[in-house]
Amino acid sequence: HFHGIHKAEMDGVFENVGPGGKFIYEFLAEPVGLHLYHCHVHPVEEHIAHGLYGAYIIDPKEGRAPADELIFMLNGLDTDFDGENNFYGANTIPFYYQHHPIEISTNELIRAYVVNILEFDAVNNFHLHGTLFHHYPAGTDTVPSGYNDMLTMSQGEREILEFEYKYPGLYMFHAHNTEFSEKGWVGSFLAKDSEKNYSDEN
């Protein structure tokens, strides 16, 4: 099932694709924004919880401001199949970005495409340390709706976040739901001074 604007036969709800089968989606890329697609075959929540989803980005014709871009798919892992998440993460692997911080440069625009595809829990959130972000709900408007360091999202919601770090250092990002962060949904940005990066490379 594709979120967005398209004909009914491209909605992906009634066209079940069996093992070895295929279905080709064709639609105009509209509207501008960050959109979701996922399996819509019952049991839907189990299929989504086990990874049958993705995201696609439609940029405005005039483009967006140059930025270092990344995507976060916020999800959970039900490892014992009891309908409750045992671990949480961004891009599937719990604690990954805590052990492998994302390297960025100071005073450089960062654009994060954030999708909450979490099942079995009603809401998720994103908290950024050391700076604030402008956020664009679903990215369908080019004017930000707020400036904050905390964002709460229901299931299926998407946001585009834009921010930069003024000072070098290691900065955490995580779910502000303590259970989620303690079970894997936590990471860090490693902001390096751009002049130091240049001198290190030459």
What kind of region is each of these model predictions?
Residues H1-N202:
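Copper-binding active sites and cupredoxin-like electron-transfer domains
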